A protein has these predicted regions:
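Periplasmic polypeptide-binding modules associated with outer-membrane biogenesis and secretion
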Residues: 1-91, 125-126, 130
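Residues that define the transmembrane beta-barrel architecture of outer-membrane proteins
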Residues: 58, 98-102, 142-150, 193-197
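Structural signature of outer-membrane beta-barrel channels/translocons
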Residues: 67-69, 107-113, 153-159, 184
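Outer-membrane beta-barrel proteins
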Residues: 68, 92-96, 110, 138-142, ...
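Sequence/structural signature of outer-membrane beta-barrel proteins
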Residues: 71, 81-87, 111, 127-133, ...
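Transmembrane beta-barrel strands of outer-membrane/channel proteins
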Residues: 76-82, 104-106, 122-128, 150-152, ...
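Outer-membrane beta-barrel translocator domains and adjoining extracellular loop/strand segments
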Residues: 87-91, 132-138, 164-169, 191-196
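Short loop/turn motifs that connect adjacent beta-strands in outer-membrane beta-barrel proteins
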Residues: 113-120, 158-176, 191
Length: 201
């Protein structure tokens, strides 16, 4: 616990109980839920202890116990699909047939970017679709289409500009902002190529 893993403001932001204030059970559960919802700790607990001192009657100490989760995470997946088509449309017949699609996705997660509980996910997806059936001229394009895309998602545990001023308002129990960027390339053999860029807040 001597390691400087988090900036103090992330702790203050999730704590609804304040020094010198009257103890409130609702604020206790709000604080506990806020720490659990942050997603950067694998275990969260708040211990309430009565101060045992003659000159400190009716006072409580709150001990916040937080066990950090692993900062980095990885995830990989593989998917396959199959479809049979008897399309005779003159425009798309060249790509009709028995289609087998295979795609793979790998994601890298940073749960505590800049020591502020900011989560950033980088994902890379690649896929290819095979045509297992010859066309009407008995010609066969083995690869029907291919695709590759990259997605970056950043999740802030607070409101960001232009709504940042509302982050400190305790009426907002849960505030979160997202910035998502996506680049993709799709190649449909003999039909079209599509490059796209998406950005969202």
């Amino acid at each position: 616990y001597h390691k400087y893993l988090f900036r103090p403001r992330i702790l203050v932001r999730n704590m609804y109980l304040r020094k010198g204030n009257l103890y409130n059970q609702a604020d206790f559960y709000k604080s506990l839920n806020a720490f659990a919802r942050a997603g950067v700790w694998q275990s969260t607990n708040i211990v309430v202890e009565e101060v045992k001192s003659k000159d400190s009657s009716n006072k409580l100490d709150l001990i916040v116990q937080l066990i950090p989760a692993k900062k980095f995470g990885y995830e990989a997946s593989l998917e396959a699909s199959y479809s049979a088509s008897s399309n005779t449309n003159s425009v798309t017949a060249a790509n009709a047939g028995n289609l087998l699609g295979v795609s793979g996705n790998i994601s890298f997660l940073n749960r505590n970017l800049n020591k502020e509980g900011i989560k950033m996910t980088n994902s890379l997806l690649a896929g290819v679709e095979f045509n297992l059936k010859p066309d009407s001229n008995n010609r066969k394009n083995l690869i029907n289409s291919n695709e590759i895309s990259y997605t970056n998602n950043i999740s802030f545990p607070r409101l960001i500009f232009p709504f940042a001023k509302f982050s400190s308002d305790k009426r907002f129990i849960s505030t979160e902002s997202f910035i998502t960027t996506r680049l993709s390339y799709i190649n449909r053999i003999n039909l079209f190529n599509l490059q796209s860029f998406n950005f969202g807040v």
